[in-house]
Amino acid sequence: MNRKDSKRKSHQECPVKTGGRGRPRQARRHKTCPSPREISKVMASMALGMLNEGGCSEDELLEKCIQSFDSAGSLRRGDHVLNMVLAMHSWVLPSAHFAARLLTLYQEATGSTQELRRLQICHLVRYWLTQHPETMHQDPQLEEVIGRFWATVEQEGNSVQQSLGDFSSRLSPGGPGPPHPMSSPGLGKKRKVSLLFDHLETGELAEHLTYLEFRSFQAITPQDLRDYVLQGSVRGCPTLEGSVGLSNSVSRWVQVMVLSRPGPAQRAQVLDKFIQVAQKLLQLHNFNTLMAVTGGLCHSAISRLKDSHAHLSPDSTKALLELTELLAAHNNYARYRRTWAGCMDFRLPVLGVHLKDLVALNEAQPDRLPDGRLHLPKLNSLYLRLQELAALQQQHPPGNASEDLLHLLTLSLDLFYTEDEIYELSYAREPRCPKSLPPSPFKAPLVVEWAPGVTPKPDTVTLGRHVEQLVESVFKNYDPDGRGTISQEDFERLSGNFPFACHGLHPPPCQGSGSFSREELTGYLLRASAICSKLGLAFLHTFQEVTFRKPTFCNSCSGFLWGVTKQGYRCRDCGLCCHRHCRDQVKVECKKRPGAKGDASPPEAPVPPTPVPQASCGSEDNLSYTLSLEPETGCHVRHAWTQTESPHPSWEPETVPLPAKASPPTESSKLNS
């Protein structure tokens, strides 16, 4: 290396040039325009500078708002400060107290020289109710103070002031509202719109999930966000709790749909389909549902399924890893934030991340300065973030939604399983291997349930409405001739949309014709949904009081069935035996025998061995499901997707099954007859 090359190399390795006094020179932006967010921040800071450098008192803030109006009700200058005060005052001052101060100022403004001031106060109150009508409806105390204010205006004000208090002038804009779903095909059309999960296109499923997500996100009000930030919980905020519950329901629905398949290859097909759905959600910029779907796919109960993941293609595995990296919590969701900032069209945020930002901003700065004045920069920062979320609620999702598919998804998401049940099903599908397994290629599970414990369950009325909507959609598309029935083949396919809810609950065909009526399908879905949603109705066993000819033990308490006749109960389908007082506490699912008859077998007929609670077993074996949880074997297994086994011939709609919870499976057994 010669001397010239050495100098050139030393210049290349030289650090960034520094300015005077050893300070690094800041990078300059050449020929670039500021972003809209930067412009809004500068405008807001300029407006705040007109008030005070760091803050102002409550009286000064009220005076500034009053002076924003002229005699005609027009704004004299920009409305940023006014809107910020009206939207954010409730964070530091109750709205009823704020309105009471305005009432006091109105009463103190007496004399002919104060008519303009009174008129300005009336314009301020009217503007407040026009721009923020929800505040009065959600605060009874504020509504009472506002009523006293307008009553005072009616008594002491002039005709112009009284006209502002007219009820017709108090507008109540409700926003654009949720998008209108696309109308379903009419009865006269001779084609079917598929309501089957296997037939749904990934893009179609992603669009409908986006519609449900946007409808839930659009219902959240600024008051809900304020209550969450100040209280630290979604309790007491129905709309926010519903949004959180929807995300958690989608995540668990993904897990249950994967685990509903009996074989590894079939589970891999569902995994691959949901990976494609996640990619479509990313294209739609629906990050909240994307977080839920990806979180469900990366949940440890799913990622541990080595045999199932072995059937995935390398491209699918790579796509899942990329989605996991995108939504990972590393560096405060840095990759998600960069992707979010680059989205310009329709987009839905990860609500938990943005609520976390609001909480951090609220906790980082005080509400008031040491001298008692309000800290306006903090209120303005919170206001700007709330405005960003409010602007997102004015969007319109791309595409149209089918009302029928929305009914199907709504009822599917109503079905609820606990975390323990999902884990137990995962271990039942692929039991633990005693040999050491290679480490999982997936990252740590995403934190999807940012509000743990939020698992809203639909009440009976809501569930019934969802079922009626779905039945209407089913007959609209699968009975175009209006005969009032659907075929058994269509019913078998439809039942596969609901993981585990339909297992063992197939009603008899209508009048033996091999078809199902509207009433039968409604009753079937109500029972299946109630079972899966844990609303108090259980179906696992069909017990019948019998007389045992040989010593028999109770499956629930392991006690002996004493007596001469009718010592206990036996399930007509699986042969499980128990005491009269134990039949409501049986915790073993009903596994129907291939040769089970509808009527009870003779008392002297042999009964398969009934297991008793084992002494010791891992927690992963404590099964509590309404379907067979046996690992994959060569035996015949009924499957809700493939419908490989015909419906049970002895199902009786008038029979009310007795509640029975699930219990740990056992290895030891005792003979009973």
Curated annotation (Swiss-Prot):
SMART domains recorded: C1, RasGEF
Sequence segments annotated as region (Disordered): 1-34, 162-188, 593-618, 638-673
Pfam families: C1_1 (PF00130), RasGEF (PF00617)
Boundaries of every EF-hand domain copy: 466-501
Gene3D superfamilies cross-referenced by the UniProt entry: 3.30.60.20, EF-hand (1.10.238.10), Ras guanine-nucleotide exchange factors catalytic domain (1.10.840.10), Son of sevenless (SoS) protein Chain: S domain 1 (1.20.870.10)
InterPro entries membership: C1-like_sf, DAG/PE-bd, EF_hand_dom, PE/DAG-bd, Ras-like_GEF, Ras-like_Gua-exchang_fac_N, Ras_GEF_dom_sf, RASGEF_cat_dom
GO CC term (a single one): cytoplasmic side of plasma membrane
Highest taxon above the source species: Eukaryota
Zn finger intervals (Phorbol-ester/DAG-type): 540-590
Swiss-Prot/TrEMBL GO biological process terms: antibacterial innate immune response; cell differentiation; phospholipase C-activating G protein-coupled receptor signaling pathway; positive regulation of natural killer cell mediated immunity; Ras protein signal transduction
Membrane-crossing segments per the record: none
Disulfide bridge map: none
UniProt-recorded name of the protein: RAS guanyl-releasing protein 4
Organism: Bos taurus
